[in-house]
């Protein structure tokens, strides 16, 4: 009797600690020790906690109700993968090779179901049209023709229905993705349809990863000449004093930034700055990252990781009359064409005490190392791609991105292209 009571007490105690558990198994030779679990708010990953490996397994205890997308990131190897939560235990096994994730095996029902549905949907959108086009070149009585016909028939079948009671998030995601983001031309939705969806959705809208693409679709539906009208109509319905209104406002500011729609970005960034109500963490983050890189602001300092061509420990340690800070990547085609132009004028710039600091968004060490052998300026990289800390700190959405700083590290110019950099210093 005592044993039964003790076991019941342990179970009760554990259930108080966690609403659900995320368990991730890795092979013995996987070298990472730390894993970070993220939830989602709109398009922003939110850190929940960091755990250390124990018996080749990471175990996260999530204390609250959560339905939506989640992500685990391994900072040492820059591996990451996504999965879902339906407020039930999540069980995942990783297959790795050379310390990189080769495959993710979902062992819980919800993630296995979601994975199969997404795989089927992708094949239907991308592969089915191609198979249908090549079918006419093969006879049905040939071995390949028969296989082709079978695969077309399989992909053409409607997906098995999803029970919204058993799988509320899977139902929400797939139903609304199909309605608002499908490539099917017959499924046209109006701006009013999208406004109603955003306004009336439950909290799964913010955790689903659908919000950003749905907003882009909303803007596209309104057309380029009606952007302000469309946005004002949406925000008037949502009310920017509400958490959802502020999340949408934050997303729109980021969208305008990514697509270089500066006039609209400035208009709605100004609206956000002038709000007198309580600001959510989501909008506050957007305001901060934009404030960091405004003209006249002091460029936030950065601690170098493995800097090349300098003994300086931080960005501010580099003394110069001006600094050109570049965010770039060895795989960026625009960087490939623009950085050599800067290289051609490097000696002229250096003679005027103008230093260049290039921070890379690479992930592949070999690619980065080979590329920087040609660049005599200060180079550094975290080798974490868009997971690099400076992507958020400096509000970087594309490469290359340029900043020009004065001797006191104040931002005095934000050139669009390398030609603008050279024109600013009159070295073209």
Segments and roles (model prediction):
Residues 1-25:
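Bacterial Sec-dependent N-terminal signal peptides
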Residues 313-342, 355-359:
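Short active-site neighborhood of thiol/selenol oxidoreductases, capturing the structured segment around
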Residues 67-69, 376-378, 395-403:
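Structural micro-motif
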């Amino acid at each position: 009797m005592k044993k039964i009571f003790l076991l019941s007490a342990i179970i009760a105690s554990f259930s108080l600690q966690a609403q659900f558990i995320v368990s991730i198994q890795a092979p013995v030779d996987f070298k990472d020790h730390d894993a970070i679990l993220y939830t989602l708010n709109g398009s922003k990953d939110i850190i929940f906690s960091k755990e250390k490996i124990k018996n080749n397994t990471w175990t996260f205890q999530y204390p609250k109700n959560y339905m939506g997308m989640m992500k685990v990131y391994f900072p040492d190897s820059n591996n990451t993968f996504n999965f879902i939560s339906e407020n039930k235990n999540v069980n995942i096994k990783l297959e790795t090779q050379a310390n990189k994730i080769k495959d993710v095996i979902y062992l819980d029902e919800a993630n296995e179901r979601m994975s199969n549905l997404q795989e089927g949907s992708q094949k239907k959108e991308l592969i089915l049209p191609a198979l249908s086009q090549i079918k006419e070149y093969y006879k049905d009585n040939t071995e390949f023709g028969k296989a082709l016909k079978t695969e077309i028939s399989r992909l053409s079948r409607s997906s098995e229905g999803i029970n919204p009671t058993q799988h509320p998030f899977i139902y929400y995601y797939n139903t609304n993705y199909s309605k608002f983001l499908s490539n099917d031309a017959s499924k046209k939705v109006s701006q009013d349809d999208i406004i109603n969806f955003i306004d009336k959705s439950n909290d799964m809208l913010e955790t689903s990863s659908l919000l950003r693409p749905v907003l882009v679709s909303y803007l596209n539906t309104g057309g380029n000449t009606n952007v302000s009208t469309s946005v004002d109509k949406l925000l008037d319905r949502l009310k920017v004093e509400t958490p959802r209104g502020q999340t949408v406002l934050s997303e729109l500011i980021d969208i305008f930034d990514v697509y270089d729609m500066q006039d609209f970005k400035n208009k709605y960034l100004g609206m956000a700055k002038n709000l007198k109500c309580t600001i959510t963490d989501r909008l506050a983050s957007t305001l901060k990252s934009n404030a960091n890189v405004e003209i006249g602001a002091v460029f936030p300092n950065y601690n170098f990781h493995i800097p090349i061509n300098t003994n300086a420990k931080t960005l501010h340690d580099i003394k110069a009359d001006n600094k050109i800070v570049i965010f770039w990547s060895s795989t960026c085609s625009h960087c490939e064409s623009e950085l050599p132009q800067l290289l051609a004028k490097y000696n002229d710039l250096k003679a005027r005490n103008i230093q260049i600091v290039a921070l890379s968004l690479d992930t592949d060490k070999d690619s980065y190392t080979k590329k920087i052998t040609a660049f005599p300026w200060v180079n550094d990289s975290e080798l974490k791609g868009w997971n690099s800390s400076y992507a958020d700190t400096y509000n970087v959405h594309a490469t290359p991105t340029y900043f020009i700083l004065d001797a006191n590290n104040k931002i005095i110019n934000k050139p669009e292209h390398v030609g603008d950099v050279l024109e600013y210093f009159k070295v073209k």
